[in-house]
């Protein structure tokens, strides 16, 4: 008698159920996340200076820094905001990219309140002049004068006109050169028009967005300008492209976008 091998009905049901479950898993993965193992925090990693010690304590200190961060050469880390700044003890963290959960001492030097003493100017040593030696004459050096920021009202966007700017940063000024909460002003020279001053944003916001600037850097973007003052006044940037990053700074009504993340402009304090 010929006997035929017949699959057990329970096995066939299990094979069909596993196939359906696998198909549903593929569909759900495609709908909700193309790569469930991807770490989306990599795009939020700020640029770092070469040679800095890794502040991580969760295993990332064993990784190559360039896997997540843009590594800036140490020689190029000059000017305001380069590297890490010393902070006063008790200062709230301005970061919004996850670094606010880290210990401040991992990257910054903590300075105790009232421990910074004012340094007095040392008196120059007397110089003996011999007969016939010409006396030194004072030399006048023309310094770049930063235009004063104009009070911006609710209708400032109606009297100002938008324009595009690009060029090399000649100098950096503003309260942001002394405090992380202050605004950064940059003077741009495009080689054609007279140099112009542009108010970017508070230093902490530029750090968080990855758009730190320094003299000699080429930047471009859009800004608002008072047509009655032309290049003699202070312009207000809507966006800036620096370090390969495009950062939005203000909306169409000249409102700073840092206000949406809880920041306070130093000029408004």
From Swiss-Prot:
In terms of domain of life, where is this protein from? Bacteria
Q: Which cofactor does it need?
A: heme
Q: Name one Pfam family in it.
A: MCR
Keyword annotations from UniProtKB, A to Z? Biomineralization, Heme, Iron, Magnetosome, Membrane, Metal-binding, Transmembrane, Transmembrane helix
GO (cellular component) term, any one = magnetosome membrane
Q: How is the cofactor bound?
A: Binds 2 heme groups per subunit via the 2 magnetochrome (MCR) motifs.
Subcellular localization: Magnetosome membrane
> Which residues take part in binding heme 1?
65, 68-69
Q: What else is known?
A: This bacteria makes up to 60 cubo-octahedral magnetosomes of about 45 nm in diameter which contain membrane-bound crystals of magnetite (Fe(3)O(4)).
Q: What is known of its domains?
A: The C-terminus of the protein cannot be tagged, suggesting it is required for function.
Q: What is this protein called?
A: Magnetosome protein MamX
């Amino acid at each position: 008698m010929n006997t035929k091998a017949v699959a057990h009905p329970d096995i066939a049901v299990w094979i069909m159920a596993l196939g359906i479950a696998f198909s549903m898993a593929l569909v759900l993965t495609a709908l909700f996340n193309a790569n469930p193992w991807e770490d989306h925090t990599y795009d939020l990693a700020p640029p770092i200076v070469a040679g800095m010690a890794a502040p991580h304590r969760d295993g990332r200190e064993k990784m190559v820094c360039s896997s997540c961060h843009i590594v800036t050469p140490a020689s190029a880390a000059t000017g305001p905001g380069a590297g890490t700044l010393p902070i006063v003890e008790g200062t709230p963290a301005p970061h919004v990219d996850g670094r606010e959960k880290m210990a401040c001492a991992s990257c910054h030097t903590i300075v105790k309140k009232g421990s910074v003493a004012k340094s007095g100017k040392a008196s120059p040593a007397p110089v003996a002049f011999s007969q016939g030696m010409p006396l030194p004459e004072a030399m006048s050096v023309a310094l770049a004068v930063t235009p004063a920021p104009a009070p911006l009202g609710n209708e400032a966007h109606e009297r100002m006109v938008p324009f595009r700017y690009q060029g090399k940063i000649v100098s950096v000024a503003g309260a942001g050169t002394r405090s992380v909460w202050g605004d950064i002003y940059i003077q741009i020279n495009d080689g054609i028009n007279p140099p112009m001053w542009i108010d970017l944003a508070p230093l902490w916001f530029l750090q968080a967005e990855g758009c730190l600037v320094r003299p000699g850097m080429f930047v471009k973007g859009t800004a608002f300008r008072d047509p009655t003052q032309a290049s003699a006044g202070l312009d207000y940037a809507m966006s800036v492209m620096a370090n390969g990053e495009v950062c939005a700074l203000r909306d169409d009504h000249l409102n700073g976008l840092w206000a949406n993340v809880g920041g306070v402009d130093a000029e408004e304090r």
